[in-house]
C-alpha cells in the first residue's frame, strides 16, 4: 500500500493475457474436456430456459468449479484460496431477506437469484464437475458470487465475452476506483 499518489499511467501490476479467464477461451477449454458433451448440453438448456444473456458467466462459473475441484493442482489455487467466502448479495439471501427489501432492490435481487437458480438447474447436465460439488450449495454460491462480483464485460460492454483477471480483480471495489485498468490484448 502506498501513502503517496503515483503518476497517472504508472504500471501497478501486470497480468499476462493467458492467465486471464475469458469466457470465450474458457468455453473452448471446457467443451474440449467434456467427454459426453455435457457442457454444451447445459448451455443449450440454459438458452432454452431464458438464460441466453448468462452463458458467458456460466462458462466462468463452471471454470471456477473445475479449478476448485483441482484443489492444490490448480494453477489458480493461491488466487482462489484468497477470495472471499462470504457474500451478502442475492444468491446468498434467505426468503426472509427478500421480504425486507424495497421493491426496486427486491426485483433486481430476484433477477440475480433466478440467474443462480438457472445455473444450478442446468448443472446436472455438466459432465466435468463431480456430483459432490454439484450438490454443495455453499460452493455453488461461492463460485456464482465470485463470477458475479469479479467478471467484467468486453471492451464494448455488450457482455458477449466476460473476463476475470486473477489478482487484478482485487482493485476498484470501493466507490471511487483506485486504479485505471488497461488492456494490451497480449
Residue spans of the language-model regions?
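Short peripheral tails and domain-boundary helices/loops at the edges of structured domains
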Residues: 31-63
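Long, positively charged leader/targeting segments at protein N-termini
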Residues: 1-19, 24-28, 66-186
